Amino acid sequence: MAQKDVLTDLTKVRNIGIMAHIDAGKTTTTERILYYTGISYKIGEVHDGAATMDWMEQEQERGITITSAATTCFWNDNQINIIDTPGHVDFTVEVERSLRVLDGAVAVFDGKEGVEPQSEQVWRQADKYEVPRICFVNKMDKIGADFYFSVRTMQERLGANVIPIQLPVGSEGDFEGVVDLVEMKAKVWSTEAKLGEKYDVVGIPTDLQEKAEEYRTNLLETVAETDEALLEKYFSGEELTVAEIKGAIRKLTISSEAYPVLCGSAFKNKGVQPMLDAVIDYLPSPLDVPAAIGHVPGKEDEEIVRKPSTDEPLSALAFKVATHPFFGKLTYVRVYSGKVDSGSQVINATKGKKERLGKLFQMHSNKENPVETASAGHIYAVIGLKDTTTGDTLADPNNQIVLESMTFPDPVIEVAIEPKTKSDQEKLSLSIQKLAEEDPTFKVHLDSETGQTVIGGMGELHLDILVDRMRREFKVEANVGKPQVAYKETIRRVVETVEYTHKKQTGGSGQFAKVIIKLEPFSGENGATYEFENKVTGGRIPREYIPSVEAGARDAMQYGVLAGYPLVNLKVTLLDGAYHDVDSSEIAFKIAGSQVLKKAAAQAQPVILEPIMAVEVTTPEDYMGDVIGDLHSRRGQIQAMKERAGTRVVRAHVPLSEMFGYVGDLRSKTQGRANYSMVFNSYSEVPANVSKEIIAKATGE
């Protein structure tokens, strides 16, 4: 095993992801890959599925998905690191972060359904990061499975240039194997072969010969066009060698000009080994992908390039943080350049903090395999990093670099959460800290008015899952409020002078303060939302009381005059006032400052602001009218419409309050074929009729 810890020859390494729609059979495919790649050093341990079973049991026992972040396995002296990608809309964060560290991917499709909405969305995200892919049409043994239909949906729905390099032998219950169009041989799994470990290479069945010739001709024409010499050879009637064909397919795949398509049935153990061969033959090694680009810490315009070599200085990206039952915090990193030993000190260049690497592991299908050194091109799990979170760069302290991070949007939806008992309060704090480390899109703050803890996330499902994890993993008993939109208030008019006198006369010394202010709308630079200016002359208000007036005004801004939402974008100018030698005090001026601001704001035409989301809907042309009509009914403003690879993309600005439950409505309107993403865009004034409703709700009228 020792020589297999880390392969130093990077041409033999593949960092891949397996991406799929929820039910396309991703887990089974991953499981079978681990099973076959494990055979080489597990012979005798495998009793009809024992390997698969113990692997799942261990998952249940430990409560973590071992496949979740990165699993290392070996195939014909090559090393494959598999990074798992989830298949759900609200977890785009998970998908984005795994795609960021992949070099290539296997897209798994359901042989009966072809391209499904989720596969469409994950495919588009992979386009964004330009990840080379091969396609595996799975479940060929299913009733209704149709390889040719699946290939057609890839062309039509994904607009992808796909090239079948295999055809199925038999279908549904009679699915036996595949025709390899590169070698022009059939690979057939007989029912006797234990768990599909062996297959026979035979001649192509007569009923498939004509079809195989037709598809082979298409393949050869595509391949020949990649290279002048091949083109000449092909048209002069010479046979292209297997090595030449594979080399050309590899070139097309790595440049994302084409996507090879294979087929099989992971569940029935057919077609998995040729798919592993294709991963090695066609997907890029760390040396085939562009060098990592970053910048000098604090100077974003000074670019640095790091090649995937152990001779370069260290650069690594943390792409996931997970909690392990025995080791505590595990940070998964992709090393882009250089090498580093366990126990070394490195710098978190993103945060400017020193970190010490504790133990280093490579996750081998079902056990942690400790390694001494982490080197370029590989993926590791690290213990002992304290300040490092998702998206941070670890670098050599003497040669710092910040790699391009992943961008995570701010939360747009919030719920208040209230622990039931004192001990739950402590558990809640711990769970929030742990979840925030793992998930960069999960945010928390304390509502000063109600004293409640408010958590924010990317969508309703996202928050449901987070709350569920608090209950299950951290045993927090808590009451959870309804999702809320974060409104704000501001003013539209200048009020030249407003005065307020605070007087209180009880026995002994009283309280006295008089202030006069001007209030006006304000839009500061760099997002400043407030300004205070003092124009009092001649000591009409002693200097020591001025800060109290400002403090009072700022307090009053926490709760607006219409519905109690925070006031933003205003400028307060203190013009004049009066004081009393005996009765004036800091507290008197603070109260006066607070009251005068409320009085002025009420006269300055106050309005409510709401968060507006930039929404992007990707939909097939047939549903375009329904989608646009629906966005209009949600007070949406259409910004742009574009065509992208056979689908339509609609961009619109829509108030967040109108987007609750949108995912369900969109699915039912488009039979699940459209999907959407939304990010916060800006705050904007609420129309009068909506404003009335918000005020009525807030004031309980």
Swiss-Prot record:
Cite the entry's keywords alphabetically. Answer: Cytoplasm, Elongation factor, GTP-binding, Nucleotide-binding, Protein biosynthesis
Looking up SUPFAM superfamilies in the UniProt record yields: EF-G C-terminal domain-like, P-loop containing nucleoside triphosphate hydrolases, Ribosomal protein S5 domain 2-like, Translation proteins
Give the GO terms filed under biological process for this record.
Answer: ribosome disassembly
* InterPro entries, A to Z: EFG_II, EFG_III, EFG_III/V, EFG_IV, EFG_V, EFG_V-like, EFTu-like_2, G_TR_CS
What SMART domains does the record point to? EFG_C, EFG_IV
Tell me a Gene Ontology molecular-function term this record carries: GTP binding
Compartments where located = Cytoplasm
Instruction: Identify its protein family.
Output: Belongs to the TRAFAC class translation factor GTPase superfamily. Classic translation factor GTPase family. EF-G/EF-2 subfamily.
Annotated NCBIfam families: EF-G (TIGR00484), PRK12740.1-5 (NF009381), small_GTP (TIGR00231)
Query: What does this protein do, in the record's words?
Result: Catalyzes the GTP-dependent ribosomal translocation step during translation elongation. During this step, the ribosome changes from the pre-translocational (PRE) to the post-translocational (POST) state as the newly formed A-site-bound peptidyl-tRNA and P-site-bound deacylated tRNA move to the P and E sites, respectively. Catalyzes the coordinated movement of the two tRNA molecules, the mRNA and conformational changes in the ribosome.
How is this protein named in the record?
A: Elongation factor G
Gene source species? Mycobacterium leprae (strain TN)
Q: State the gene name recorded for this protein.
A: fusA
